């Protein structure tokens, strides 16, 4: 048997070109999140996009989540952004012991509205239609 055999490799793509472009817009819309939290979103070619989170020098990233559709990526990054904002609001207070929902309920109504309206801002930046 010859050792010079050629193997045909077929590269399967797990994300469509359209979704790749949409995901790029979502990743760009949430750029401020990457500065606030130890999160990095990367285009990994035919595999889609990955969110790397919770970095430690000894072990690298604890969480790696792969996205192949822009809507789930948008919703996940929205929740990360909101949770980060709520954490920052509660930091240094007894509220930090509460869950994110409870922290949100403790906020003044105007602040709640302001936070929720930010989702529409991100959606517009990412060219995503909210449902």
Regions found by a protein language model. Give the residues of each.
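Negatively charged, low-complexity tracts enriched in Asp/Glu with abundant Ser/Thr
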Residues: 1-39, 122-128
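Acidic, low-complexity, intrinsically disordered interaction modules
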Residues: 41-122
């Amino acid at each position: 048997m010859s050792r010079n055999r050629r193997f045909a490799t077929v590269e399967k793509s797990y994300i469509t070109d359209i979704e790749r472009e949409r995901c790029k817009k979502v990743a760009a819309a949430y750029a401020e999140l990457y500065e606030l939290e130890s999160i990095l979103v990367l285009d990994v070619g035919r595999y889609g996009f990955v969110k790397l989170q919770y970095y430690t020098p000894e072990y690298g990233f604890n969480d790696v989540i792969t996205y192949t559709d822009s809507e789930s990526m948008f919703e996940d990054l929205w929740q990360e952004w909101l949770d980060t904002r709520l954490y920052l609001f509660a930091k240094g207070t007894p509220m930090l012991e509460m869950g994110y929902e409870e922290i949100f309920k403790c906020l003044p109504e105007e602040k709640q509205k302001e936070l929720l309206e930010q989702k529409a801002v991100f959606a517009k930046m990412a060219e995503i239609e909210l449902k």
